[in-house]
């Protein structure tokens, strides 16, 4: 049994992988429409991808919309993510604003988790961001995304262990495979993390059509969360959420 992180009524790191659905609307109307749709799906967590939100550089608008989302989502956990352009996101912002924005979001009390990128800054600065978010009882998913390649297994493990050392509650890595061997590399790293470095739950995925199996086999290999789309996918290879749920349940039933 590895580490378990509880967010409201959701336990990450236990049993069937949980499902997060990203919201990728560019304005309030689109986002609230997405929320109305996702509440009827088989999800566990809602991820607000604020890099898609056109007013993301206006903190007060972000906070106001987050408050409205929290009210509408009832007890569904919220993960807020600003994905930087260099890791596949929609836009780039300064490091200073990245820190300011995430701290302001944490201080509202209207989110449960915040994604912080491993390579957002130097290690000490990233560690400090995590410590400050923890002061608001926020769970931190520390992440790294490579949309071009799959690093060697040892490098994947090294990055996830580094996330744990910097205070992450959950370590996440997503990579792009160029071959089936790359997919196996990711699955092997996931399995080794689960068996030897289970200080935190982990989230891993191999993106694109080649890597779809990694979004389904988390219970077997050790990935605690998978991402499904309700409308538009936020990453290549994401499956429709209700179809994803059916497959996860089927796999779990035969374990």
Curated annotation (Swiss-Prot):
Task performed by this protein: Involved in the third step of the chorismate pathway, which leads to the biosynthesis of aromatic amino acids. Catalyzes the cis-dehydration of 3-dehydroquinate (DHQ) and introduces the first double bond of the aromatic ring to yield 3-dehydroshikimate.
InterPro entries (UniProt xref): Aldolase_TIM, DHquinase_I, Type-I_3-dehydroquinase
Organism, scientific name: Clostridium kluyveri (strain ATCC 8527 / DSM 555 / NBRC 12016 / NCIMB 10680 / K1)
Keyword Metal-binding: no
Gene name of the record: aroD
Catalytic activity entry: 3-dehydroquinate = 3-dehydroshikimate + H2O
Any single Pfam family the record assigns to this protein: DHquinase_I
EC number of the protein: 4.2.1.10
GO aspect biological process, one term: aromatic amino acid family biosynthetic process
Keywords: Amino-acid biosynthesis, Aromatic amino acid biosynthesis, Lyase, Schiff base
Active site: 145 (proton donor/acceptor), 172 (schiff-base intermediate with substrate)
A single GO molecular function term of this UniProt record: 3-dehydroquinate dehydratase activity
HAMAP family, sorted: AroD (MF_00214)
List of residues binding 3-dehydroquinate: 47-49, 83, 215, 234, 238
Protein name: 3-dehydroquinate dehydratase
Enzyme class of the recorded protein, top EC level: lyase
Record text on subunit structure and interactions: Homodimer.
